[in-house]
Amino acid sequence: MSVLELLPAIDVTGGQAVRLSSGSVDAGSWGSPIDVARSFDEAGARWVHLVDLDLAFGRGENSELLARVIRETPVRVELSGGITSRAAIEAGLAMGPERVNVATQALARIDDVCEAVDSFGERVAVCLDVRGDRLAARGGCGEGSDVWEVLRVLNEAGVARV
């Protein structure tokens, strides 16, 4: 039986770890993402979910900083934010996280996601944004697909984490 493990999230925009409130950055800053990752490690977290909000929303990126977080902290990292293509999966994995979390938008090219899973195995997880029983991808890519059909395809492709 698999075990549920909750991952604390570090959302990064403009080089700072930020607090989100209902999806908005209005809640303020936590400061350095490296310091936040270290504090989660000291509190006993085995993993963090590290998100590049700027890349996810198409307003820049924080790749160098996130690579430093991955290198300089002992906590295991699931990297997320703007990972919507095979090239983005490869670039994300090259930064050194344990795994990347592919955005729902990438499912508009589900064959590419399945090929990446075939190449990288459990290092590729898939995020599904769902409303009811339909995908609800930001930007409309893949929006409206039946979640159960998508789960069937991902399961057949060997996706271990959704």
Over which residues does each language-model region extend?
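Conserved anion-binding
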Residues: 2, 12-25, 90-93, 97-161
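Charged helix-capping and loop-helix junction motifs
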Residues: 29, 33, 60-67, 110, ...
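Glycine-rich beta-strand-to-loop/alpha-helix junction loops that act as flexible
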Residues: 51-53, 78-84
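Alpha-helix-loop-beta-strand connector modules within alpha/beta enzyme cores
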Residues: 58-81, 111-130
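Glycine-rich, proline-tolerant flexible connector loops at the mouths of alpha/beta enzymes
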Residues: 47-65, 104
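Catalytic domains of carbohydrate-active enzymes, especially glycoside hydrolases
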Residues: 35-51, 95, 156-158, 162
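Short catalytic helix/loop segments, enriched in acidic residues and glycine
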Residues: 23-41
